[in-house]
């Protein structure tokens, strides 16, 4: 043991350094928040709960191209479609198994009409696994509920896409 180490051990140098660090941060603003009542701002690129969007006239955006189903690495998306009278296709079944989803965002990137998006909601805890099997009605209701925030996030992210 060197003389310097011996002096530091007798003077409790580590103890002084620890208390100095505590005092330094004691007078700074807090870094934590009171979570349920205060929330940090989310990035426009945040990937949360899935939603199906509609056009302003109320028609579903999804054209049943099934690109999102094909690109999903977790195989969490299931789509069934049928043609309409005007020759276009629309989905009859659009299911997402949220227990399989890895929130990679590939479905959102692959969609040519921005129909499937990952919205800003991250608080969707459930009591059963069955509640995490989202059908078309649940996805459309998510889209209706979060449309304003989703549109703002897509607009903010548009220069980078």
Swiss-Prot record:
What InterPro entries does the annotation carry? 4Fe4S_Fe-S-bd, 4Fe4S_Fe_S_CS, NADH_quinone_OxRdtase_chainI
Family matches, as SUPFAM superfamilies: 4Fe-4S ferredoxins (SSF54862)
Provide a Gene Ontology MF annotation, just one: iron ion binding
Kind of enzyme, top EC level?
translocase
Q: Which residues bind [4Fe-4S] cluster 2?
A: 72, 101, 104, 107
GO biological process annotations for this chain's record?
A: aerobic respiration
* First-listed, main subcellular location of the protein, grouped into a coarse class: membrane
Could you tell me what reaction this enzyme catalyses?
Answer: a quinone + NADH + 5 H(+)(in) = a quinol + NAD(+) + 4 H(+)(out)
Provide the membrane topology annotation. Answer: Peripheral membrane protein
- What residue stretches are annotated with the 4Fe-4S ferredoxin-type domain? 52-82, 92-121
Gene3D superfamilies annotated for this entry? 3.30.70.3270
Q: One Pfam family name from the record?
A: Fer4_7
> EC number(s) on record?
7.1.1.-
Please give the subunit comment from the record: NDH-1 is composed of 14 different subunits. Subunits NuoA, H, J, K, L, M, N constitute the membrane sector of the complex.
Family (UniProt): Belongs to the complex I 23 kDa subunit family.
Q: What is this protein called?
A: NADH-quinone oxidoreductase subunit I
What is the native source organism of this protein? Novosphingobium aromaticivorans (strain ATCC 700278 / DSM 12444 / CCUG 56034 / CIP 105152 / NBRC 16084 / F199)
Q: Which gene encodes it?
A: nuoI
């Amino acid at each position: 043991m060197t003389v310097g180490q011996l002096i530091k051990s007798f003077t409790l140098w580590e103890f002084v350094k620890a208390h100095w660090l505590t005092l330094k941060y004691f007078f700074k603003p807090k870094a934590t928040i009171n979570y349920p009542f205060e929330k940090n701002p989310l990035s426009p690129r945040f990937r949360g709960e899935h939603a199906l969007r509609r056009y302003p006239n109320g028609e579903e955006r999804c054209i049943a191209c099934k690109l999102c189903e094909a690109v999903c690495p977790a195989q969490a998306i299931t789509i069934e479609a049928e043609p309409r009278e005007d020759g276009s296709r629309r989905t009859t079944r659009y299911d997402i198994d949220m227990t399989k989803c890895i929130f990679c965002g590939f479905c959102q990137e692959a969609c040519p009409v921005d129909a499937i998006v990952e919205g800003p909601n991250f608080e969707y805890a459930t009591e059963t696994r069955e509640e995490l099997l989202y059908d078309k009605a649940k996805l459309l209701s998510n889209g209706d509920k979060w449309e304003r925030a989703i549109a703002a996030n897509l607009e903010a992210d548009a220069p980078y896409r």
